């Protein structure tokens, strides 16, 4: 008797792998994708099985194929060539340790994108937070806090929203040939934690709803209760969907007996408000409790579409309900970017999938692979029998609560398996991803497919404007970037694949369609503005701009952004508004990023101007906060770390002013021969590219220079009245004072010079008849195109012929001329290029860092010793890590949170704990060997400021 494995029977077929049994059955026409059977089984068994997620801060977290680890990646600009790519994997070792070998099944980011929840197969949840970099995530809640119980497996999960109002944009509509954007303030949807801490709601397989929440001391606590079920068989849940609404948390559950239950749950806190400034321990912290308001039970769900009229089923395939199993359950909210508020009610979306392999009773050719079933959630009044009207008391009827109604909508059939449903672009688009890698965008209200040709005069989203994901390799898990410009897919091997959205930009069939091009630019503008208003990472938008738009199209986009965000570039009058303007740093960062080529190539002028203004803004805000934190009563002692940062920025600000002055002296000498020929002067000015000249002409950067001078005066005057200092604080403040005392340009002289420039610019505007309505145009020309507008040519002549010569008598020009400004990174000379290749400057502290190779140890002054003219140096350990900005590629030497409370408050107020001066996020990197320079580094001149003398460039952070 032959063995069962003989005669051509493949052992792999017994385990569901594709192949032929050679038993007379015709093989399937299309072999299933590797891993798809396991993925479908996983989606049927449990609702929480998301293996990859992209946070709003830009961090991609995914579970490895073995289910034991979590890795993180992120978008980054590569310093070597300026290309935007996906970073290398960084394993989160605390996750593996926390779950003790239990398979990881689900992960989810919170609304802000800073905290990550990870659940394992036993329902144990651990929580992590992005601390100082995208790949530096610290544990906050250990999984060991939860019991090891199969019934506690998570089938639904939702983070509580943050109680904050954000700026939103409804749409872009073309009015008289120009796009008009619809900004409004969007209020958050509760429930909220009264302390604005994190909260996580979970539904377990056994029908328990849990709330994990943080107390004011950042420790985690938990409450739980059972959902109201109609019977014991309903308590075994497979899926749950949760969403925050105005009336509480809406919960939809699906049980093993295929019943759909709907709950409305409120979270009540006692006390309802908590003020950490007034409540002192042992005052009670807010404690939550659950309250169930409504319950709705839907009977056994069928997927044939019984809601249709008999004639509607004609031509549709015939199949039975028993073939299908629920693989996805979601609650879809109306679009969030709606100035009128949420006018429509939520939808419940369920995906039912057929078995992957055909059976004799149910051939696969006769049934679709997936059926998307939808219900509209309506609220109706309770209708009583007329006899109740005869009852004298109407008290009971007056207090009756409205009932929930589920109205079934038209089903959607597909011959492909839907593996993911995501509501993206702030609720304006529903993206359905199929197993072959295709992504289809739908209107959430009507489920109509976006094709990008319906209306080129109104733009609500990227998908509606014609952006799409081209067909690529298949995958089993999908996550979209914060602004849906990119997506990351996990393939069958568990490898991440980056996918980018594309658009024709009006180039079709060799012709140019201006309407489609304009709509595409407006859609990208809308995505960028929504991200800025919601504090969402916008690196995915920059990635598309860099890869797909020409230089001319990028300029068009920048102009649209300035108009959409209503950024008035004219600050000749209202300069105080400049410091608190939330959109200006984002616009400047965008321009700087678009002009970045690589770490060693100078930026183009339209990129170098905003980059320099970002540095000026950083110093201005630093000085403002420095005085704010040290004028309380009683006055707090100055913090050494804060003073060190002030010292570095003071030296940078002074040297920047020297650099500007030196360049203007050279320009004045160059244009001196054309003093009597205005036409020749104008023509030469058109061909002249000077960053210092543009910086002085722009009212925005000129205002920041004035703020810096005000801050330097305050620091110099405050030295005499400062509280007694000791240790490093005394050393740093003394050096700040000496640096200002020995400056070749006095602060009052430079302020007088700025006043002269300001007068020349005002006079030029006044002479040309430019009022407040006309001035933003030339100011924007300075910022966006780095060109001197015709109206300011006379101002340049006045500055070079009168203002600059008046400054010469009040400065030490020899010292300024002999200075080496290569460390500023602004010039295009050979010395600056060599400095870029051999050294880094801490972008926050403005302190030059030592060059560290991967296995070198740099000699340093002993700890506590002070160089001749520099701050104390610390020994550098081997293989020291640093932080690099993923957007501008600049470096920070701090790889740990600030040590002191004052320093932490300062960095947090500046918004630099997790992000760079440009707004890009930090990533931890290993030290790299410096790029070789053609010649040895040029020694510093004798006129340098203290930190740039003695041992070259002082200070490592």
Curated annotation (Swiss-Prot):
One of its GO terms (cellular component) is mediator complex. It is found in: Nucleus. Keywords: Activator, Nucleus, Transcription, Transcription regulation. GO terms for biological process: positive regulation of DNA-templated transcription. Its main location: nucleus. Residues 855-883 are annotated as: Disordered. Component of the Mediator complex, a coactivator involved in the regulated transcription of nearly all RNA polymerase II-dependent genes. Mediator functions as a bridge to convey information from gene-specific regulatory proteins to the basal RNA polymerase II transcription machinery. Mediator is recruited to promoters by direct interactions with regulatory proteins and serves as a scaffold for the assembly of a functional preinitiation complex with RNA polymerase II and the general transcription factors. Belongs to the Mediator complex subunit 16 family. Component of the Mediator complex. This is Mediator of RNA polymerase II transcription subunit 16. It comes from Aspergillus clavatus (strain ATCC 1007 / CBS 513.65 / DSM 816 / NCTC 3887 / NRRL 1 / QM 1276 / 107).
